Amino acid sequence: MKNLKVIISGGGTGGHIFPAVAIANTIKKRVPNADILFVGANGRMEMEKVPQAGYKIKGLNIAGFQRGSIVKNIGLPLKMLSSILGAYNIVRGFKPDVAVGVGGYASGPLLRTASFIGVPTVIQEQNSFAGITNKLLARNASVICTAYDGMEKVFPKHKIVLTGNPIRSEIVNSTATRSEAMKYFGLDENKRTIIV
């Protein structure tokens, strides 16, 4: 039996990277011999954080659209073409069984290419307000995993699976007490703390 091969793509911020790592960790826990490859944007946070988590990563030469600055977007069409060619080479070389996108620049060309080649694609949307990349990819996605109800306003209802947000096991299994956490973050236990 062949090993399960999964490409996970996206990043740019911890809000994309850490759920992606949680997905990879869960896959490895359930299918220990799974071969997982991350694809991110060159020069972005994922190129450092993913290898620290123990996974391989390849980078695409991609950047997002800079709102309000035409000058900063002059090279964007070339970067898009370069990233699509790079994604094509990665997908053809790795031959994944499935491609997972978590949002961010790199997931766009990677999932678009995987879908075009015939690889099933999964989008994971962590937010109640869907990101631009995931909105653009939704039409061709096989499955769209969401963290919140009501996402059929943005995504095709028949593709949505309510999964909640992927959380890394070291957070779920933490034995830290409330008191230890308050002390660690320098917060006063007698005051109400709201995280925004």
Q: Which residue ranges define each predicted feature?
A:
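Glycosyltransferases and closely related glycan-assembly transferases
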Residues: 86-100, 106-122, 135-143
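An amphipathic, basic-hydrophobic alpha-helix
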Residues: 65-98
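Glycine-rich phosphate-binding loop signature in dinucleotide/nucleotide-binding domains
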Residues: 31, 90-95, 185-189
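Short amphipathic alpha-helix
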Residues: 16-27
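Active-site-proximal region of nucleotide-activated glycan assembly enzymes
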Residues: 115-178, 187
